[in-house]
Regions:
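Core of compact, soluble alpha-helical bundle domains
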Residues: 1-129
Length: 129
């Protein structure tokens, strides 16, 4: 078995501090993305929810989803996103921001694919319009 298969994605990403740095950049991109903010419900949420709180929950979730010791304590994806009526175009903009962030931090291709698979697994609960 390859070493990569024996090491969690969480560890291969560098643990909580590395994940938090990537999430910090990613959420900054998402919060100011004009495509996402053209949706009035998303824009309102971006002004109502603090970026720091959003970053905390996303970091917690990414750590948990990648095999880290953290436990996600936020609401479920459908519950937190259903009222936003996110479209396919907004999802694509979100994914582009995610890809740009991973490129900025030189996340290796194998780990990028694994992270995208995790993100993609949430699409059905997030894209509701």
């Amino acid at each position: 078995m390859a070493t990569q298969e024996l090491t969690s994605l969480y560890d291969r990403l560098g643990g909580v501090y590395s994940i938090a740095a990537v999430v910090d950049d990613f959420i900054d991109r998402v919060m100011k993305n004009p495509i996402l903010n053209a949706n009035p419900a998303v824009d309102e949420a971006h002004h109502r929810v603090s970026a720091a709180g959003f970053k905390y929950y996303v970091t917690e979730m990414v750590c948990w989803a990648t095999g880290g010791p953290q436990h996600y304590s936020g609401r479920g994806m459908r519950e937190s996103h259903d009222h936003l009526k996110i479209t396919e175009g907004e999802w694509a903009a979100f994914c582009e921001d995610f890809d740009d962030t991973m490129a900025k931090f030189n996340v290796p291709e194998a780990e990028r694919k694994e992270l995208f698979a995790i993100v993609e697994s949430t699409k059905g609960d997030i894209v509701t319009a």
